Amino acid sequence: MKIFVTGVTGFLGQELAETLISHGHEIATLTRNVARGDRATNTESMIKGETISGVRYYFGDLTDYLVVSDALKDFQPDVIIHLAAQTSVAYSFTHMKEVFDVNFIGVFNMSEAARREVPNLKRFIWSGSAEEYGIQPEEAYPTKEDDLQLHAASPYGVAKIASENWLKYLNLAYGFPCVVFRNANSFGRKHSHQFVIESIIFQMIQGKSPIKLGDPEPIRDFIFEPDLLDAYVMAAESNSSEILGEAINITTSEPISIRDLAAEIAKITNYHGEIQWNSFPKRALEIPKLNMDNSKAKRLLGWEPKHTLKEGLNITASYWMK
């Protein structure tokens, strides 16, 4: 198949593109030729503008509709996997317009250009987020996809909900073949320690005391990068029409507080120092709990995580401790 993947300079995108190529698919992407954020591998080469072997490159910005439209019209993909996004919730509080431009306008441009220019598109797979659930009553956990109102608790969440609503509108109005993944907090990064698990590991292996962390009380679900990658590959290669128009939780469904998460990582890294909690300002609207049910992914995709949270933590820590 011909698969258009955005975000190939990101945490998941490069490895996903390489995996799909190894499966015999033809891959294209849109890039500004400047890597930003996290890279799963080969960071320096991506910054220098070197390319992934076997990927066809179109150059431009996702926020430029004409650039997006021309690329999709030329490539005519069977499947689009839209990963490109500004991924930091914290960043969204201080850079609202940038986050909305990338995380909503980028989705609008990709999907509308695909609807108009790619008549034989089979699937448009988009990365939503657990953040879309926001603050829910305790009895709602673990949250399922179809029986809850979404509540944004950050500018990031607002943009994600807007994007999902737009895609679902296209599906209902025009039969647009979208698939929405509501992803748990992902981890397994090899070149960035700006997210919670990698930050804790990085600080602990430095051996300094105290390490500085934020609020210890929020409870979160996580998903290990190889398991998240599997979900995208399975959705891309699926022939099932049941997944079209659906939102699907991608998570290990192993909720853990940040305090307990840090304690688990301390065991793995043999850290015995102090943790200085609440070292950073709290979010304007903190979500106390994000815990999702993954039964729909098992039922519709045949997907389930191959790694427990603890197994993923051990593998990630082992990489950083090399």
Spell out what each predicted region is:
Residues 1-186:
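N-terminal Rossmann-like NAD(P)+-binding domain of SDR-like oxidoreductases, especially those catalyzing
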Residues 19, 205-322:
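C-terminal substrate-binding subdomain of Rossmann-fold SDR/epimerase-dehydratase oxidoreductases
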Residues 66, 78, 90, 97, ...:
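Residues in well-ordered alpha-helical elements
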Residues 69, 73, 115, 168, ...:
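Solvent-exposed, non-membrane alpha-helical residues enriched in polar/charged side chains
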Residues 125, 132-138, 175, 191, ...:
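Proline-centered turn/helix-capping motifs that create local helix->coil transitions or kinks
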Residues 138-141, 193-203:
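A glycine/serine/threonine-rich, flexible loop-to-helix segment
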Residues 162, 166, 170, 200, ...:
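Hydrophobic alpha-helix immediately C-terminal to the catalytic Tyr-X-X-X-Lys motif of short-chain
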